Amino acid sequence: DVYKRQTHHNTGDQWCIYPMYTFAHPIEDALEQITHSICTLEFEDQRPFYDWLLERLAESGLLQTPPPRQYEFARLNVTYVITSKRKLKQLVDEGHVAGWDDPRMPTIVGLRRRGYTPQALQLFAERSGISKSGGWIDYSSLEGALREDLDEKAPRAMAVLDPIKLVITNWDALHGEGTLDSCTAPVHPHHPERGQRTFQFGRELWIERTDYEETPPKGFFRLYPPQTLADGSTKPGNRVRLKYGHVIQCTGAVKNIDGEVIEVHAELVPDTKSGTPGADSVKVKGVITWVGLTDAVEAEVRLYDRLFADPHPDAGGKNFLEALNPDSLSVATAYLEPSLAQAQAGDTFQFERHGYFVADREDHKPGRPVFNKSTGLRDSWGK
């Protein structure tokens, strides 16, 4: 009905006409001086009425020409995403997400908080194109557009997301107790004009827990202790380069009463500091990232992933709530290199080896940094 005797929340009882959408759509477009009204394919059958009503309004002098034009295209469907406002509202109302700006939500505020840039979204739209036939765009295309945009922009930094302490047992003997060694790295490897960043190497560092294996699998080139071989001989612990720093050789580890490794021990190989003469004389296959214990910045890092585990969560009458990904968010207490202490809300960085991260627009504060994972360095979903 277009006539309904009911109080309106804005105009009260002054106006009692509630036009149907089909009737209101062309009039509102004309009043707002819309030139191109872009609709999905289900509105194609309504275009004759849309044009007819605008023609009548023009004939009566109530509408300035030229009138709006309606165009219909297929909906842009992205795998692992739902765009139904009703279903998105249900996710918010039932607490499955933290709000409309939750970084897992496909809303503008959600994507922005996740670290998506206007340029990345424009690139994604250009690559997706327009069509009259329905289809699906893989979520990896959206992430790929973001990676391509951020690769040129984002400063680099080292971060340890699952930390375990590394102790260089011969550091004091080689360099003196309490001594620190400054290491440098480019802010951006492809833009030397953006300068260098500096951090401290010392006796105690943080490394990723996964960079140590007590019994290494085949092809593991990171840290492991001396190994006893089948013939009874001993294979020395593995050597790796600490990126931008020195080569070290693993000597063992310390465990707690439950048998969990809580500390990795290694010895520094002298004269192997990156950028110094002879540094490459010792060849290693593994390079790992690290953060110095003395100047590390502790931070909350929110590791976001796809909200749904099913590529088509609401297709064919499915209950989309049953397709929610239980691992779409995990929170880590991480250690970051000192350059990130100055990060402002909304700043984006590439955490080396991990991916692209953005300082959260709501919760990131001086002295309490919070970073959201935007995307990995490559598409690894389901791999």
Go through the PLM ranges and name each one.
Residues H8-H9:
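Catalytic core of the metallo-beta-lactamase
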Residues I17-L31, Y116:
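Conserved phosphate/anionic-ligand binding catalytic regions in large, soluble enzymes, centered on
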